[in-house]
Amino acid sequence: MIIVVTGAAGPAGKAAVRRLTASGHTVIGVDRTGADGTLAVDLLDHEAVRKLAADVQAEHGRIDGLIHLVGGWRGSKTFAETKLEDAALLHDLLVRTLQHVTLAFEPLLKASGRGRFAIVSAKAAERPTQGNAAYGAAKAAAEAWTLAFADALEGTPATANILVVKALVHEGMRAASPDKTFPGFTDVDDLAAAIEGLWDTDANGTRMDLTT
């Protein structure tokens, strides 16, 4: 399969690329930084994202999956200390990049025999704490957009789903804090396994809870 992974230079992206590549798929890693062999694309530039979609189609003829793993977090101790510039940043990272990739890749996913799209969301979207106001609002907006995208895919073989975590953990975090147990966190390798499992289900417009 031909699978695009955005945010591919981050811990979750690296785990997804590693898993999907090991399974024999052609994975196109995309990241703003261009680090670790990824394609350097600014996902806040809609025209650049449209060009990415056109380039993928020209080179591979199709796309079987788009896994959007661009993330970010900003928070505060109290609601009153919330910084609106943090809210704006999170809107850019979590919502605008999502809007651009779904609008650009929708035709390719619809044309695929089994196209899959997914984002990672957080429990904070459904039950935000006061210090997570900006983050929870951005995640909730991203979920709403993804569910609308899922509705647009109804009647086609393609699906769009939301993978829900409390938070993610990776080996670097464990090495930095060997005494922490990270209760309720989802390992990025387990997330990668869940991503690969999307092609084994026809579920569409579903919030898949990885915390249970």
Where are these regions (language model features)?
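Catalytic loop of short-chain dehydrogenase/reductase
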Residues: 90, 110, 116-154, 167
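C-terminal helical subdomain
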Residues: 155-158, 162-163, 170, 179-212
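Rossmann-fold cofactor-recognition segment
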Residues: 32-47
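N-terminal Rossmann NAD(P)H-binding glycine-rich loop of SDR-like oxidoreductase domains
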Residues: 9-18
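Amphipathic alpha-helical dimer-interface segment in Rossmann-like NAD(P)H-dependent oxidoreductases
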Residues: 17, 54-58, 93-113, 150-151
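Conserved mid-core segment of classical short-chain dehydrogenase/reductases
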Residues: 50, 71-88, 131-134
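Active-site loop of short-chain dehydrogenase/reductase
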Residues: 62-64, 109-123, 155-159, 203-206
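Catalytic Tyr-X3-Lys loop
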Residues: 80-100, 117-118, 142
